[in-house]
UniProtKB/Swiss-Prot annotation:
Classification of source organism: Eukaryota, Sar, Alveolata, Ciliophora, Intramacronucleata
Subunit note: Homodimer.
Protein name (record): Mating pheromone Er-11
Entry's Gene Ontology molecular function annotations: pheromone activity
Organism field: Euplotes raikovi
Main localisation: secreted
Length: 39
C-alpha cells in the first residue's frame, strides 16, 4: 500500500502524506531501515 511504499522509499514526507494515523509506525520503520538524511 502507499504507506508501506512511503516507508520503503525512506521518506518521512510520504509517511505524512499517506500513513495518516500510522505515521509513527512509518517514521520508526524509516529510522530503523534507512540511512540519514531522511527526505
Amino acid at each position: 500500500d502507499e504507506c508501506a511504499n512511503a516507508a520503503a522509499q525512506c521518506s518521512i514526507t510520504l509517511c505524512n502524506l499517506y500513513c495518516g494515523p500510522l505515521i509513527e509506525i512509518c517514521e520508526l520503520t524509516v529510522m530503523q531501515n534507512c540511512e540519514p538524511p531522511f527526505s
